[in-house]
Amino acid sequence: MKGVVMFPDKVLRKKIEPVKKIDKKTLREIEELKIILQESENGAGLAAPQIGVNKSFFGIKEKGGVRMLINPKLIAVYGEKVYPKMVDNEGKESDFLEGCLSFPDLFGTVKRYLKIEAEWEEVKNGKLESRNKTMMGFEAILWQHEYDHLLGILFVDHIKEDGGKLYLWKGEEKKKISIDEVLKKEK
């Protein structure tokens, strides 16, 4: 079984191919991604390029398992991109820090739409069936993050473009680091 591909592996920037038919190989790749995501402690989503597969699908953890989204498309966005916030149990607000399994211990502030509409396909009885949904909050943020992977866009690209903050977070220690230091590893 494959593992999660780490930055700066070039497969993370590759243009993916749509899934045209559900054959044994594709079903095996989908199942493999699903297992890797289920077994990951910190992952909320995982895209095919992150396991070295050049196909258009990703998985999102939900209550009761992993939903696999095939050939996803972003249909509409609502409002403006913003830096999402979190509120803890005491009502204290802080920046929502986005992470990625391909960037262990790195987290950053990423501008995202808080409401989106999307469509995709799911495998049912060996065939692809269409789905669509309007999503808000964390679900919308997660969907955009995984969808970006299919376009070769990484969360650090948004941080660089929008001037967000990037942190190295190991255990209890969190320190701000330079986005340029991370991106220069790609060269």
Regions from the PLM with identified roles:
Residues 1-187:
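Positively charged
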